Amino acid sequence: MDQRGKDTTLALHSRMSGDQTAQDPGSSLGELDQHNVVKRVVALPLVRATCTAVSGAYNSAKDRHPLLGSACRFAEHCVCSVATCALDHAQPLLEHLQPKLATVNDLACRGLDKLEEKLPFLQQPSDTVVTSAKDAVAKSVTGVVDLAQRGRRWSGELRRSVSQAMDTVLRRSVSQAMDTVLGKSEELVDHFLPMTEAELVALATESQGPEVGSVEEQRQKQGYFVRLGSLSARLRHLAYQHSLGKLRESKHRTQEMLAQLQKTLELIQHMQSRASPTPTFHHPKVQELCGDWSPCLENGYRHSQVELETLALSRSLTLELQSAVDALAGCVRGLPPSAQAKVAEVQRSVDALQATFADAHCLGDVAPTALAEGQDSVAQAHACVDEFLDLVLRAMPLAWLVGPFAPILVERSEPLINLATCVDEVVGDPDPRWAHMDWPAQQRAWEAEPADPGGQEAEPPLGQVKHTMMPELDF
């Protein structure tokens, strides 16, 4: 819009304030502009800069496009003509409404004053307003971003704090549980498998050193895995010593019974030959019979009584030997077939002796050949017991042991129908590592293995074999 359009637009407002100028001829032009709301609005820097920018764009568009410029100039001419004609015809009406227009102008000026007070940017150019708006938006966005970053940092710190607190509580709970379990396990091991005399002497020797705490204090200073590994190794060692002690006790008892039975067989042999035996017997009953035998050689009644007592003693020793061998057989359950074969050989010898004296009513019923075979069987059983213990001492994997950690084994004619269910109730779910094993078939295969024709056992391995009882706890 060119200058003519502006002049036409302001003509109406000039005429509106014409009467006021006539009534107050002493007022200045500045005061008149201050009371004309349209001029004040146009004089605002923001409006003036905006109008200047719009006018510049309008003129530039007219100059750039000739057709558009011709149309715009024609429109401007029409608007100016219409406005001039309208002002000429509206002059009487404007003169009639002059007081009311003055009142409206005054109210509008007051409202503009308040608006300028509330909106100071109206007194600033558009470039300054745009720059201020950009700065305000940038500050707002920066504040929001900072707030979001602080919230994210706070949430991260809160999450880390909660995680550390939970880790601390969990670690403390696990530590206390591990201490309790290890302590209770060590107490149970000390109770059921006490230390041997050699271990007690070694511990007493170590405690004489400077600044050596008790066993409990030393255990508390060790780590969990060290304590667990030490407990596993100690448990294996004590279990080995315990089982070995049981085997030695059974061996000594069996050999003692075999020695007494051997002396009894020698006594029977002397009785059959009517010779006086040499008093080299350890069993009190055998010594008594040996002492009573010589005086009663000439007394037939006393001779028969001594024979009956000797047979009764032989049967009693055979039964005691049978129970001792059964106890030894119970200790070797789970050992390899070679070790079980030794015990089975001893059992067969004892069964043969028991059959020899089962049907005898007097010493004459015992054949000299059966008596000699019995002595050979006793000597062979004695040697088998020694060989068995030597075999166990040379190579005894702890997985063979059936000691205090296994339930009592009971012989049955046939396996239980619900054997798998019973085993699962004891050991939990079946271990997939052994699911493919057919244990009854393996046991039958072991029993069906032919004996060594040479009567000699295979040589044990020269190297030391590492035996593992609990692979999960072997570090």
UniProtKB/Swiss-Prot annotation:
**Cell compartments where the protein resides:** Lipid droplet; Cytoplasm; Mitochondrion
List the residue ranges of the region (Recruits mitochondria at the lipid droplet surface). 456-475
Any idea which UniProt keywords this protein has?
Cytoplasm, Lipid droplet, Mitochondrion, Phosphoprotein
Question: Pfam family example for this protein?
Answer: Perilipin
Q: Where is this region: Interaction with PNPLA2 and ABHD5?
A: 212-475
Q: What coarse category fits the chief subcellular location reported for this protein?
A: other
**Domain of life per record:** Eukaryota
Q: What is the protein's given name?
A: Perilipin-5
Region annotated Essential for lipid droplet targeting, chain positions = 1-200
**Residues with the Phosphoserine modification:** 17, 175, 349
Q: Cellular component per GO? A: cytoplasm; cytosol; lipid droplet; mitochondrion
User: What ranges does the record give for the region Interaction with LIPE, renumbered to this chain?
Assistant: 1-123
GO terms, biological process: lipid droplet organization; lipid storage; mitochondrion localization; negative regulation of fatty acid beta-oxidation; negative regulation of lipase activity; negative regulation of lipid catabolic process; negative regulation of peroxisome proliferator activated receptor signaling pathway; negative regulation of reactive oxygen species metabolic process
Q: Which Gene Ontology terms cover its molecular function? A: identical protein binding; lipase binding
How is the polypeptide modified once translated?
A: Phosphorylated by PKA. Phosphorylated on serine in skeletal muscle at rest or upon lipolytic stimulation.
| Annotated segments matching region Disordered | 1-31, 447-475
Indicate the family of this protein. Belongs to the perilipin family.
List compositional bias (Polar residues) regions by residue number. Answer: 17-26
Gene behind the chain: Plin5
Question: Any coiled-coil ranges, and where?
Answer: none
Q: What quaternary structure, including any partners, is listed in this protein's UniProt entry? A: Homooligomer. Interacts with PNPLA2; prevents interaction of PNPLA2 with ABHD5. Interacts with ABHD5; targets ABHD5 to lipid droplets and promotes interaction of ABHD5 with PNPLA2. Interacts with LIPE.
What does the UniProt record say this protein does?
Lipid droplet-associated protein that maintains the balance between lipogenesis and lipolysis and also regulates fatty acid oxidation in oxidative tissues. Recruits mitochondria to the surface of lipid droplets and is involved in lipid droplet homeostasis by regulating both the storage of fatty acids in the form of triglycerides and the release of fatty acids for mitochondrial fatty acid oxidation. In lipid droplet triacylglycerol hydrolysis, plays a role as a scaffolding protein for three major key lipolytic players: ABHD5, PNPLA2 and LIPE.
